[in-house]
Design a protein with these regions (language model features):
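Short acidic, glycine/serine/threonine-rich loops at helix termini
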Residues: 58-64, 89-92, 120-124, 149-157, ...
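Catalytic or ion-translocation cores adjacent to nucleophile or general acid/base/metal-coordination motifs
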Residues: 144, 498-543, 734-745, 751-754
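Thiamine diphosphate
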Residues: 1-175, 201-204, 272-273, 280, ...
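Active-site cofactor/cluster-binding pocket
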Residues: 118, 536-539, 552, 678-713, ...
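Flexible, low-complexity linker and terminal segments
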Residues: 1-29, 33-34, 172-427, 432, ...
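Short helix-loop-beta junction
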Residues: 62-70, 292-309, 730-738
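Conserved thiamine diphosphate
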Residues: 145-195, 201, 226-239, 485, ...
Length: 855
């Protein structure tokens, strides 16, 4: 019997077991907190603010979708202009009732921001944490970290920034603990009068799981304190010296006391009288450790037999000492496993130093000083399992360990034989960046944060970048010592609104020769197409640039945009977009700071709006006549568009336009070619649904699930790869199984490689890490071959274990826009996939044709 499930279940508090992703879990947590306060007869409100950025790039989208629901619960969502302004707003929320001027008993706050946003907000974090939180309010700060650097310019670990501001840090393992730790975090924040950090990694925030969302799941204990509850809260007339003393002498001890009473740290494998070896971990690494022990065939019974126990630390700073000491008592060896810099290891060594029978500790290094668990990159469960096995093998008698070490090392050996590099992200069809990032011959441009960062790997003479908001300020330091007289700086309207205008003002003050090329695409494209905070428009940007002293400002626009040109021309010279090169040539001759505002709506956002009839659809289509086309590739060179595909004929390679993917930009017609045909009043013919007959499908043999069934789904961004993972997870949930999915997010993935990791288990509690480990995939669903046969994918597969079904469609990459002869080595890629898992385990067929007939 399938469950009766609706899409609204995730936010209905009466539903216990729900399927949610990490971001949705955070939304539910705010609703749960409001519910719990009402049960305590507290009239509270919620305030959510921050700034988007992977892996917390969709927090604002999820809260915006349920704005009506949260408003009814007095939860206000207000996206910040940038991270530190948002954090300052939350500081203000804790002062709401401080002076007797509020209608509420308190405001519980939630801040979100990516690692770079944590860095730029250090000043306000320190000030607001010292000031404290309100008795019935509290603040959680969700730090979005990207340990693997999959969608960031640096590999971030934010705990040390929070530690430096003396903000306690909770590190959840999985989606369930995102909810649980949020509730615990607000309670801790109220009790101790501190902000509380919440570690949000891709493996938790971008994961989807079945969780227990009961609002009454947790029973919070408020320990007795030497001071009355509320006396550690924010107050009027406080002094810096009193704040510092209170933080060290009262608040941080209260944090540890709360953690002990509420058992935030807990045992995994239970400690017994026989236990001599202990493993400590936290957060995402805890899930990796659980999986690593599975790979060693060590379950709770085996652990008991060999004297192994484990300890999960939830509060990673400051670590609660009493629970740790009690657990560690009698242990001879402790292995500390944590990803990146070793935040816990130093604390644990300090806590256990000088204790009776002090254990030997393995952490970043072994007892001889050799590197054990690295600081850079990420830790893989297979590597963790090998390191654990090698330590255990010297201390216990377990015959199977040596064999497991040999087998696991084979998985790590570099045997992948991919014939091509992985697919890289590319500008969408019709993306304004295809035209706006072009620079004149002899000029050089800088990139920055945004989709235009991808120009770095295209033929755009673009080199170098800065952090968000620093765009162009590096030229202030480079220009006096450079032989180059002028530079071009690309900048998105989102960055301009966030903080970029300050760099432009600095450049004006320094009077350097630079042209800022600001794309106004009417959306924060990289993170999901959100509206700009404050709804700043292109006209306002032009006016602002003139007001701050930019020498010359020119507007360049796509003529399909509906602009009131009379208004714009009162502010700046306005030119069609085909004048972009000569406009840059003109401005590089001007001494001082100049600017171009390039006005063209984001292609992906146009597509979304057109589906909702919110954006006009041109009444024409462009086709290529293959009889005339000579395959010169000038159309691709002019447009940089990935919707121009090769068409192989008996007369050689021609070109065709993928009408399904085309976003109606029409810049391809600028190619010097007579083969283009423009058809007015044209609509793509759709197949009548009645004309398609579904074949009779044979019921498949369902594999037996032993622990988990691990699926890797690959394909090209924008083709429904994420949707497949979501469907599989929901189907498993409907059958009462456990399901977990981890999605690729961040930098615009249209045209780039997408990997979805999906795990299915008999019961939700059987799931640990959702990321599929090296050589641990049971099944591969390949949307196309280039990603499916990449080294990244092949490393997850294993002969005699993995079975694959792969689409044979030839999905060319962005390289084809620059190289007219580029083609994918389909046969070679297929051979490499078959060589990895065996020729009889790969089903390879063209799946795009029958599916495209249905849409």
């Amino acid at each position: 019997m399938l469950k009766n499930v609706s899409l609204d279940d995730k936010y209905k508090l009466e539903n216990k077991f729900i399927l949610v992703n990490g971001t949705q879990a955070l939304v539910r947590a705010t609703l749960i907190q409001k519910f719990r306060d009402e049960k305590e007869n507290l009239k509270t409100a919620g305030f959510v603010t921050g700034y988007r950025g992977s892996p917390v790039g969709n927090v604002d989208l999820q809260f915006s979708k349920v704005k009506k629901l949260i408003s009814e619960k007095d939860i206000k969502f207000h996206p910040g202009l940038n991270e530190d302004i948002a954090a300052t707003s939350l500081w203000g929320s804790q002062q709401a009732e401080m002076r007797g001027e509020s209608n509420y008993d308190g405001v519980f706050g939630f801040w979100y921001g990516k690692g770079p946003g944590v860095d730029r907000s250090g000043d306000v974090f320190r000030h607001s944490n010292l000031a404290g939180t309100s008795k019935n309010g509290g603040v959680i700060a969700a730090m979005g970290d990207d340990h693997s650097g999959e969608s960031s310019t640096v590999l971030f670990q934010s705990e040390y920034a929070f530690k430096d501001a003396m903000i306690p840090i909770l590190s959840p393992s999985g989606v369930q603990e995102l909810i649980d730790y949020s509730i615990l975090g607000w309670a801790l924040s109220r009790y101790a009068g501190v902000w509380v950090g919440l570690k949000c990694l891709k493996d938790t925030i971008d994961a989807t799981e079945v969780v227990d969302g009961s609002p009454d799941k947790l029973k919070i204990i408020y320990p007795e304190n030497p001071v009355k509850r509320g006396e550690l809260s924010i107050r009027v007339g406080d002094t810096p010296h009193a704040q510092e003393e209170r933080l060290h002498r009262q608040k941080l001890p209260a944090v540890k006391k709360f953690a002990l009473e509420n058992k935030i740290d807990r045992e995994g494998f239970k400690k017994t009288k026989l236990s001599k070896i202990g493993i400590i971990s936290s957060g995402k690494s805890w899930l990796d450790v659980e999986h690593a022990l599975e790979l060693l065939n060590i379950d709770s019974e085996t652990a008991k037999e060999i004297g192994l126990t484990s300890y999960k630390i939830g509060l990673v700073w400051p670590i609660e000492p009493n629970g740790l000491k009690n657990w560690a008592k009698g242990l001879k060896t402790i292995i500390i496993i944590e990803e990146k810099r070793k935040l816990m290891e130093e604390q644990i060594k300090n806590i256990l130093f000088g204790t009776e029978n002090q254990p030997q500790i393995f952490g970043e290094r072994d007892l001889q000083g050799n590197l054990l668990f690295k600081n850079e990159g990420v830790l893989e469960p297979v590597d963790i399992s090998i390191k654990i096995a090698q330590i255990l093998d010297k201390q216990i008698n377990l015959k199977s360990l040596q064999n497991r070490i040999i087998l696991l090392k084979e998985l790590l050996s570099p045997k992948s034989n991919a014939v091509v590099d992985d697919r890289t992200p590319y500008f969408c069809s019709g993306c304004p960046h295809n035209s706006s990032t072009k620079v004149p011959e002899g000029s050089r441009a800088y990139a920055g944060i945004g989709c235009h960062y991808m120009a770095l790997w295209m033929d755009r003479n673009t080199e170098g970048y800065t952090h968000m908001g620093g765009e162009g300020a590096n030229w202030i330091g480079e220009a006096p010592f450079s032989t180059r007289e002028h530079i071009i700086q690309n900048m998105g309207d989102g960055t301009y609104n966030h903080s970029g205008i300050m760099s432009i003002r600095a450049s004006v003050a320094a009077n350097v020769n630079i042209t800022y090329k600001i794309l106004y695409n009417d959306a924060v494209a990289m993170t999901g197409g959100q509206q700009h905070d404050g709804d700043i428009g292109a006209l306002e940007i032009l006016q602002e640039l003139k007001a701050i002293g930019v020498k010359k400002v020119i507007g360049v626009f796509d003529e399909k945009e509906q602009l009131n040109l009379d208004k714009f021309k009162q502010v700046a010279d306005m030119r069609p977009r085909d004048k972009i090169i000569e406009t840059q040539e003109e401005l590089r001759k001007v001494k001082g700071v100049t600017a171009i505002v390039y006005i063209q709506t984001c292609a992906a956002e146009k597509r979304r709006r057109r589906k909702k009839n919110l954006f006009p659809t041109p009444n024409k289509r462009v086709f290529i006549n293959p009889e005339v086309c000579e395959g010169c590739g000038d159309c691709g060179s002019k447009s940089n568009c990935v919707s121009i595909l090769p068409k192989e004929t008996i007369l050689g390679r021609k070109r065709q336009i993928n009408q399904s993917a085309c976003n109606l930009d029409f810049s391809c017609v600028n190619g010097f070619c007579p083969s283009f045909v423009t058809v007015s009043d044209a609509k793509i013919k759709k197949l009548e649904t009645t004309s398609f007959q579904f074949p009779k499908l044979i019921n498949p043999k369902i594999p037996t699930i032993d622990k988990t069934f691990n699926i890797v789904i690959t394909g090209v961004g924008g083709t429904g790869v994420v949707t497949i993972g979501a469907i599989l997870a929901m189907a498993s949930h409907l059958e009462g199984k456990g399901a977990g999915v981890m999605e690729m997010t961040g930098l615009a993935q249209k045209g780039g490689a997408v990997h979805i990791h999906c795990k299915i288990s008999k019961k939700p509690e059987d799931l640990n890490a959702i990321r599929v480990a090296i050589g641990d995939a049971d099944s591969l669903i390949g949307g196309e071959l280039m990603v499916s046969a990449s080294n990244k994918t092949l490393s997850l597969l294993k002969r005699d274990k993995t079975k694959a079904v792969c689409n044979s469609v030839e999905a060319n990459s962005g390289e084809f826009t620059r190289d007219r002869n580029f083609s994918l080595p389909q046969e070679g890629m297929l051979l490499s996939l078959k060589a990895k898992i065996g020729p009889d385990t790969v089903s390879y067929t063209h799946l795009t044709l029958p599916t495209s007939d249905l849409v």
